[in-house]
Amino acid sequence: MVQTRLDMGALKPIDDLMFRVMAQSKDFCEEVLRVLLEDPGLTVVECTPQSAVTNPHGRSAVLDALCELSGGGFVDVEVQRVDEGDLQRRARYYASLVTADRTGPGDRFEDVPDVCVAIVCEFDPFGAARSLYHMDRVLRETGEAGDNGLAEVYVNALARDGSEVAALMRLFVEGDAYDDARFPETSSEKRRLRETEVGRMAMGSVIEEIRAEGEAKGEAKGKLETICGFVRDGLVSVQDAAASAGVDADEIRRALAAQR
């Protein structure tokens, strides 16, 4: 128990576990987004940490924090400690999932919601020593800016360039850094989780949730592997296996294809 407390006390907002708990606070998310999106008047209506967006025919995703803004747009905030994978393609895919998930069957294209993906990195994603990077759409032939409602923002949490973004990111990556004057919500939530028993209990409950989720995924994976084995051996058809096990037939087919 002592070791667990020490470990949780060493966590920072850039860590997935602490961010997952801090993102339950709408005020924290609003404070962060006002800085990252450079909009002091921004208002967050709702924030959902670990928001699941599904693709019935392909890869789904669990977003670190999906925030709905007062103007009707959405911001997906991701924290990334390790430089792995293609961040730009990840941003594009996550934005497409949110767009599809929040657009109704009869909605007109002009009513498709604006979506922003903001990825906070504990490394410099583009190597230019900037605290903030914006990926914009530009009409190649004229140089004019285009706007299809998608925005991408990449944050270098290690930059120390004197900007407000850099000052906020110092709280994200340095354990003992606080700034109650400029970032009261971030500072108070961080202090609560790191230094109080109530905060440690909150993070401990999330750890238990994560452990339970992992066990459930393991059981589901084992069940699917068993079903695929029966189908490969010709003991049962895909449709019959799906019906008896309560598993989607397409999911079985995808698993079989992946095992070939």
Model features per residue range: what roles?
Residues 1-260:
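Elongated, amphipathic alpha-helical interaction scaffolds
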